[in-house]
Amino acid sequence: MIIYLHGFDSNSPGNHEKVLQLQFIDSDVRLISYSTRHPKHDMQHLLKEVDKMLQLNVDDRPLICGVGLGGYWAERIGFLCDIRQVVFNPNLFPYENMEGKIDRPEEYADIATKCVTNFREKNRDRCLVILSRHDEALDSHRSAKELHHFYEIVWDEEQTHKFKNISPHLQRIKAFKTLG
């Protein structure tokens, strides 16, 4: 089972494309939709939905995957639910760049203070990070600097922030999922 979390643009047709691409790895790909505008509510909703899926799951190596803001959530929810994560261009600093786009961006900073201390150290090697060198929305080098101590970083030379085509990375993701 692969759980897919969309980014801030929940209506992007690229979400359906990524789900179809992920089905080459596992036929059971589940998209969880969330508001993107209410961080504390989103966290509760995502935890509840992922837990529900895991309770009914027969796959002993589930994976959670997210792009952009979905990558932010996939890393955290995956850690809290003890499943491996794959994140594409994760938005690691939404409290800085979501101002004016959502109702309460400061909730992201509050969530960070309430998260497990040094959670990335405890999550070491359980997240695969795929970053675009041509991310027009986020500073991918800042993300790499933040994450490379804990996770493997894979650089993509062609995709932009929304990562329309993940197919060049499917074999790597499949191998990472298999390690589960």
Swiss-Prot record:
Among InterPro entries, the record links this protein to: AB_hydrolase_fold, UPF0227, UPF0227/Esterase_YqiA
SUPFAM superfamilies xref list: alpha/beta-Hydrolases (SSF53474)
The region annotated as signal peptide is none
Domain of life, per the record?
A: Bacteria
Which HAMAP family does this UniProt record tie to the protein? UPF0227
Family from the record: Belongs to the UPF0227 family.
Q: What is this protein called?
A: UPF0227 protein CKO_01948
What is the native source organism of this protein?
Answer: Citrobacter koseri (strain ATCC BAA-895 / CDC 4225-83 / SGSC4696)
